[in-house]
């Protein structure tokens, strides 16, 4: 019985652990999902954005007490505008998905929503981390040696 409880706890901890992508693994995944050049945004820009928003962590979340919204996933997509977390007042849900979908190891939903974000007039400038850490910088380091 004790062994079953321990096994259950181990399995539970594995299920809730985040996938933190290796740099080149994420670069290849984003390229495969059509991010390189999407709306004129290079793969290196997406990689820099993901690095500074989440550290390549699929399960990253950050609560914003000012407007009571939360940023979700590898791109830190906000619940005020883009997804539904069931608790953000006045949420728009422009990506038409649950915020939990942005926390999955399979980042296809997160990529689709990020593509929706950049179709708005702000484009990639919607992300503060991109403006502060990536804009007008040499970003080759984010894809260097990845074969993409």
Swiss-Prot record:
Its EC number is 3.2.1.17. One of its GO terms (biological process) is defense response to Gram-negative bacterium. Keywords: Antimicrobial, Bacteriolytic enzyme, Disulfide bond, Glycosidase, Hydrolase, Secreted, Signal. Pfam families: Lys (PF00062). The keyword Secreted applies. Disulfide bonds join 24-146, 48-134, 83-99, 95-113. The keyword Zinc does not apply. GO terms for cellular component: extracellular region. The active site is at 53, 71. It is found in: Secreted. InterPro entries: Glyco_hydro_22, Glyco_hydro_22_CS, Glyco_hydro_22_lys, Lysozyme-like_dom_sf. GO terms for molecular function: lysozyme activity. It catalyses: Hydrolysis of (1->4)-beta-linkages between N-acetylmuramic acid and N-acetyl-D-glucosamine residues in a peptidoglycan and between N-acetyl-D-glucosamine residues in chitodextrins. Residues 1-18 form the signal peptide. Its main location: secreted. Residues 19-148 form the C-type lysozyme domain. Monomer. Belongs to the glycosyl hydrolase 22 family. Lysozyme C is capable of both hydrolysis and transglycosylation; it also shows a slight esterase activity. It acts rapidly on both peptide-substituted and unsubstituted peptidoglycan, and slowly on chitin oligosaccharides. Lysozymes have primarily a bacteriolytic function; those in tissues and body fluids are associated with the monocyte-macrophage system and enhance the activity of immunoagents. This is Lysozyme C. It comes from Hylobates lar (Lar gibbon).
């Amino acid at each position: 019985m004790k062994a079953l409880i321990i096994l259950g706890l181990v399995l539970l901890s594995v299920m809730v652990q985040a996938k933190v992508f290796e740099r080149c693994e994420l670069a290849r995944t984003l390229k495969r999902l059509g991010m390189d050049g999407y709306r004129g945004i290079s793969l290196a820009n997406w990689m820099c954005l993901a690095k500074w928003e989440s550290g390549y962590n699929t399960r990253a979340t950050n609560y914003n007490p000012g407007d009571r919204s939360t940023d979700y996933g590898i791109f830190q997509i906000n619940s005020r505008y883009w997804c539904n977390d069931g608790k953000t007042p006045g949420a728009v849900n422009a990506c038409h998905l649950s915020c939990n979908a942005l926390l999955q190891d399979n980042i296809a939903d997160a990529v689709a929503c990020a593509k929706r974000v950049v179709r708005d007039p702000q484009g990639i400038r919607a992300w503060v981390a991109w403006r502060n850490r990536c804009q007008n910088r040499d970003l080759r380091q984010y894809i260097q040696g990845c074969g993409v």
